[in-house]
């Protein structure tokens, strides 16, 4: 599983550099990374928490290096800029026992990923064929996830005792995350 996570990183960087991000290969690799993150987390293949977000930011940043971004995306740059005071404020409001670095990185990685994604996608045109390719790239790790759940999840009658979600039927991982990613697929 760690090899799979490493392969996504290495192949994604190689693929974007080789193609010089034409036609929006960074978006394709970002979609694949988002979809594969739950599978990687379930099997222990991530190196850090929020590995998928870091891959998305890396791939889209590489894509912006090759194909640029719209200069009119000022509102998204302002969004990223205004995240700085939130980091300062969060350090003041955290209690003494909290690991400040971990708390800040965990809470700020989502908005930063959203801002970078918005800057990359702003005024970027996609053909219908390219969109189908991105959806396909997003769907492939979901097939792997469904196969894993089919073989790993126990008999439902043995573990379901009520209407609450449980970790056993979701392959030993967070039921909300697994349900969300399968719902997107």
Q: What is each model feature region?
A:
Residues 67-73, 121-132:
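Membrane-interface junctions at the ends of membrane-embedded or membrane-associated helices
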Residues 113-120, 129-161, 171-185:
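Alpha-helical transmembrane segments of multi-pass inner-membrane proteins
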Residues 14-107:
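N-terminal hydrophobic segments of proteins, predominantly signal-anchor/transmembrane helices
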Residues 94-99, 156-167:
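Membrane-interface helix termini and inter-helical loops of multi-pass transporters
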Residues 4-12, 50-60, 102-118, 176-185:
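Hydrophobic core segments of transmembrane alpha-helices in multi-pass, intramembrane catalytic enzymes
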Residues 36-40, 121, 148:
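Alpha-helical membrane-inserting segments
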Residues 81-83, 117-122:
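Plant-biased detector of terminal regions, especially N-terminal secretory signal peptides
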């Amino acid at each position: 599983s760690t090899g799979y996570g490493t392969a996504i990183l290495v192949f994604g960087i190689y693929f974007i550099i080789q193609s010089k991000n034409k036609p929006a290969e960074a978006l394709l690799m970002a979609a694949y990374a988002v979809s594969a993150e739950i599978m990687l987390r379930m099997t222990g293949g991530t190196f850090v928490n929020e590995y998928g977000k870091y891959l998305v930011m890396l791939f889209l940043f590489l894509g912006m290096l090759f194909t640029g971004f719209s200069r009119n995306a000022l509102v998204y740059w302002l969004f990223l800029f205004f995240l700085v005071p939130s980091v300062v404020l969060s350090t003041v409001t955290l209690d003494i026992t909290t690991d400040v670095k971990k708390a800040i990185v965990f809470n700020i990685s989502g908005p930063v990923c959203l801002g970078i994604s918005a800057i990359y996608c702003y005024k970027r045109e996609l053909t219908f064929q390219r969109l189908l390719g991105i959806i396909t790239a997003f769907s492939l790790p979901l097939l792997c996830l469904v196969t894993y759940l089919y073989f790993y999840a126990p008999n439902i009658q043995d573990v379901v005792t009520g209407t609450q979600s449980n970790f056993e039927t979701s392959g030993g991982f967070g039921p909300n995350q697994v349900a969300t990613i399968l719902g997107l697929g």
